[in-house]
């Protein structure tokens, strides 16, 4: 979007705010999802049944803007993220669940609609997992918002095109939900 290759960007709000702070004037023009689907999924056999069990564990975390809710959560719990004694070791997780399946991490980042089910498909049962929703922990953020460059909003033709795109997109989502 910064280079002009796109008019509208899909982004998580923390990443968009970080980009805005660095000078990329993004504006959220639509927020289709009201709740976060982000979770931290942990192996019970690693001794984790509550967030109080996180210290001295390895937690897989997505970056590229997805780390902000995690860091907020650890700050709220007063748990260091530098691998020090009493803190957690942060494993920069790819967008897969291999670290929990291969026991490289005690917990991994998952989404309710995707990676959690990859953990299940990978051979772990729900009864073998402790799952912590970012919503339930009070540290969720808005995901998958639609953003534009602020300066484009002064162009009536752009605003019209974006409005038509949003109406069509929401109509498509409504159709998908109903069918």
Regions found by a protein language model. Name each.
Residues 1-102, 106-113, 132-134, 140:
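Short, glycine-/small- and polar/acidic-enriched structural segments
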Residues 14, 95-179:
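Pocket-lining segment of extracytoplasmic ligand-binding domains
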């Amino acid at each position: 979007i910064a280079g002009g290759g796109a008019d509208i960007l899909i982004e998580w709000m923390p990443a968009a705010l970080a980009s805005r702070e660095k000078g990329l004037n993004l504006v959220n023009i639509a927020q289709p999802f009201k709740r976060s689907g982000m979770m931290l999924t942990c192996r019970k056999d690693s001794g984790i049944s509550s967030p109080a069990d996180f210290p001295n564990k390895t937690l897989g975390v997505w970056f590229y803007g997805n780390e902000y809710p995690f860091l907020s959560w650890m700050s709220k719990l007063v748990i260091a993220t530098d691998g020090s004694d009493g803190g957690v070791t942060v494993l920069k997780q790819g967008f897969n669940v291999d670290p929990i399946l291969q026991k490289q991490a005690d917990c991994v980042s998952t989404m309710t609609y995707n990676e959690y089910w990859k953990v299940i498909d990978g051979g772990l049962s729900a009864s073998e997992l402790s799952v912590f929703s970012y919503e339930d922990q009070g540290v969720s953020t808005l995901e998958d918002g639609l953003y534009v460059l602020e300066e484009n909003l002064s162009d009536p033709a752009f605003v019209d095109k974006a409005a038509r795109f949003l109406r069509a997109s929401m109509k498509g989502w409504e159709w998908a939900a109903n069918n």
